[in-house]
Amino acid sequence: MPELPEVETVRRGLQPFMEGATVVRVEQNRPDLRFAFPENFAERLSGRRIEALGRRAKYLTVHLDDGLSIISHLGMSGSFRIEAEDAQGLPGGFHHERSKNSLHDHVVFHLMRPDGASARIIYNDPRRFGFMLFAEKGALEEHPLLKDLGVEPTGNLLSGEVLAALFKGRRTPLKAALLDQRLIAGLGNIYVCEALWRPGLSPMRAAGSVAGEMDVMERLAGAIRSVIAQAIAAGGSSLKDYIQADGALGYFQHSFSVYGREGKPCRNPACGGTVERVVQSGRSTFFCASCQT
């Protein structure tokens, strides 16, 4: 499933083509994805101007000139394809290959850009686990999907002090705490594994056991911020590749320290250990037992 860096890269890739554009018409090719489309979905969007594209955690938000917002999630296999005069590609690289089969094109947004050029933004989703919902004017922040989300792991909002407060008294493993969207919004399996490796923290360690160690909390917060920032930057680089060579993967998977590297040497030069894989809450966890304690 695409995580925060991939969703942010998708947002940045779509932004030049969607912000300021007018929705000429919408082709809706089925009544539902994971959830049913909102009533009169295509009709309510036609003629509206797109004011801004945003992101909250792993959700894309599209803000229209009448105050209506679209909340979109890519699910397991969703992607947007740009077809325009000056671009053709899949914005946002992800570790797993995505479909380009037009049979799975479920929504097509026909846009007129401010410069008079036209563009089509196509949503493709073979497994149909993504969705698009409406948030009425003034109701976005209180939408059930968004209102309980935690702090964003980007910029300086996530600090050691914030992590310490979130983890205090929690017996859940560190990995589970970091994946809890009510605490930190947008982190997923890949980047949690990578972030825990950098400061040498075991994913099985109880979150509350490190809450009082401020130096550890600062290192973990810094690792989370840097992993996310580097992954976004790598996704941005892959965006250029997608325009030139459709379907190429992003770059960050070449920098994985532990994720997907079971049985391979730890990349900590002072370690000498081997990357292991265990299952936590039904998900694969990759870590080095020698240097992550």
Curated annotation (Swiss-Prot):
Reactions performed catalytically: Hydrolysis of DNA containing ring-opened 7-methylguanine residues, releasing 2,6-diamino-4-hydroxy-5-(N-methyl)formamidopyrimidine; 2'-deoxyribonucleotide-(2'-deoxyribose 5'-phosphate)-2'-deoxyribonucleotide-DNA = a 3'-end 2'-deoxyribonucleotide-(2,3-dehydro-2,3-deoxyribose 5'-phosphate)-DNA + a 5'-end 5'-phospho-2'-deoxyribonucleoside-DNA + H(+)
EC number assigned by the record: 3.2.2.23, 4.2.99.18
Record flagged with keyword DNA-binding: yes
UniProt cross-references to CDD domains, sorted A to Z: EcFpg-like_N (cd08966)
Superkingdom field: Bacteria
SMART domains, per the entry: Fapy_DNA_glyco, H2TH
Bound cofactor: record note: Binds 1 zinc ion per subunit.
Keywords, sorted A to Z: DNA damage, DNA repair, DNA-binding, Glycosidase, Hydrolase, Lyase, Metal-binding, Multifunctional enzyme, Zinc, Zinc-finger
FPG-type zinc finger segments: 257-293
Molecular-function GO terms, alphabetical: 8-oxo-7,8-dihydroguanine DNA N-glycosylase activity; class I DNA-(apurinic or apyrimidinic site) endonuclease activity; damaged DNA binding; zinc ion binding
Cofactor requirement: Zn(2+)
Residues the record marks as active site: 2-3, 58, 283
GO biological process: base-excision repair
Sequence positions that bind DNA: 104, 127, 170
Pfam families registered for this protein in UniProt: Fapy_DNA_glyco, H2TH, zf-FPG_IleRS
Family: Belongs to the FPG family.
Function: Involved in base excision repair of DNA damaged by oxidation or by mutagenic agents. Acts as a DNA glycosylase that recognizes and removes damaged bases. Has a preference for oxidized purines, such as 7,8-dihydro-8-oxoguanine (8-oxoG). Has AP (apurinic/apyrimidinic) lyase activity and introduces nicks in the DNA strand. Cleaves the DNA backbone by beta-delta elimination to generate a single-strand break at the site of the removed base with both 3'- and 5'-phosphates.
NCBIfam families: fpg, PRK01103.1
Subunit (UniProt): Monomer.
Name by which UniProt lists this protein: Formamidopyrimidine-DNA glycosylase
Gene from which this protein is expressed: mutM
